[in-house]
UniProtKB/Swiss-Prot annotation:
One of its GO terms (molecular function) is metal ion binding. The keyword Metal-binding applies. The keyword DNA-binding does not apply. Belongs to the arsA ATPase family. The active site is at D63. This is ATPase GET3. Zn(2+) binds at C283, C286. Signal peptide: none annotated.
Length: 341
């Protein structure tokens, strides 16, 4: 008997992600979990399903590993690009390490060169990177800034592993601290630096430090606006991806607790890589692993009885390319029926 049968049908929620397709107000979907559990495959597959019911869908990778290009067999960059074979599904990969440099360059060039050769660019960059989590915060802010200028009906984030994702979601607080520190430095040294820069011809594009700080304040306002949307369950949800093992389950529980503390909705869990050996299977390892997985599946059912829990099988081939992703995505909507155990 499968673990699904251990929960009464009338008490259990639909074991699919169909509810996300039916929620027409949904604008932001985050897909996250521990490394190596199938986040990218799940986010790509969900994007494919959403593209069937929405006018325009954007899939964004904020994971430094960037697996979207590998999943679809197509190169993506920091500009949104239509995915081959689709008319309304685009993808982009943001480099989390590039956004602060881009912002602080503020007029062209890199590092010291962009600050008139005075080393101020390096100083500002070091200051920014010295604040814990600011890299995640700023890269996320840059993503939002780009997304805000585009017109997509729903946006899916293929996020970095759990720790990075949770820091991403704390970015408003982190950015406030960064801005406060920069404002303090500007008050203390701004007139002197502007005077020195004036003698050296100023910053590229005729900007000054006040203009840079003004840009950062504008960025903060964008973040505040989108952050309000993130806390609206009608607009935003987080899909947790895990496997039926202790560490993954532990990470998922920690993530759900943190998401709840941030007031971000989460009600869907995708459990990947499940083994379903047939009744006559002679694979002892498969049976032993299935026994372990059933134990953790039971725990998931007990812990998250008010969640949509989707069970996905371990496949014999890698899920890469449009065809295989489409096949995998169907199982997110139409539950996989395992062989009789």
């Amino acid at each position: 008997m499968s673990s699904a049968a251990m929960v009464k049908a009338e008490d259990s929620l639909e074991p699919t992600l169909q509810n996300l397709l039916d929620q027409k107000t949904l604008r932001w979907v985050f897909v996250g979990g521990k490394g190596g559990v199938g986040k990218t495959t799940t986010s790509c597959s969900l994007a494919i399903q959403l593209a069937k019911v929405r006018k325009s869908v954007l899939l964004i990778s904020t994971d430094p590993a960037h697996n979207l290009s590998d999943a679809f067999g197509q190169k993506f960059g920091k500009e949104a690009r239509l995915i081959d074979g689709f008319t309304n599904l685009s993808a982009m990969e943001i480099d989390p390490n590039g956004s602060i440099q881009d912002l602080l360059a503020a007029g062209g060039g890199q590092g010291d060169d962009s600050m008139g050769g005075l080393g101020i660019g390096g100083m500002m960059q070091d200051l920014a990177f010295s604040i814990p989590g600011v890299d995640e915060a700023m890269s996320f802010a840059e993503v939002l800034k780009q997304v805000k200028s585009l017109s997509y009906e729903v946006i899916i984030f293929d996020t970095a592993p759990t720790g990075h994702t949770l820091r991403f979601l704390q970015f408003p607080t982190v950015l406030e601290k960064a801005l406060a520190k920069l404002a303090q430095l500007s008050t203390q040294f701004g007139p002197m630096l502007n005077s020195i820069l004036g003698g050296r011809g100023g910053l590229p594009g005729g900007q000054n430090l006040d203009e840079i700080l003004s840009k950062m304040e504008s960025l903060r306002e964008t973040i505040a606006e989108v952050n309000a949307q993130f806390k609206d369950a009608d607009l935003t949800t987080f899909v947790c991806v895990c496997i039926a093992e202790f560490l993954s389950l532990y990470e998922t529980e920690r993530m759900i607790q943190e998401l709840t503390s941030y007031h971000i909705d989460t009600h869907c869990i995708v459990v990947n890589q499940l083994l379903f050996p047939g009744k006559d299977s002679s694979c002892e390892q498969c049976k032993a692993r299935r026994k372990m997985q059933k134990k953790y599946l039971n725990e998931i059912e007990e812990l998250y009885e008010d969640f949509n829990v989707v069970r996905m099988p371990m496949l014999v081939e890698e899920v890469r390319g449009k065809e295989k992703l489409e096949k995998f995505s169907d199982m997110l909507i139409h539950p996989y029926v395992p062989p009789q155990e």
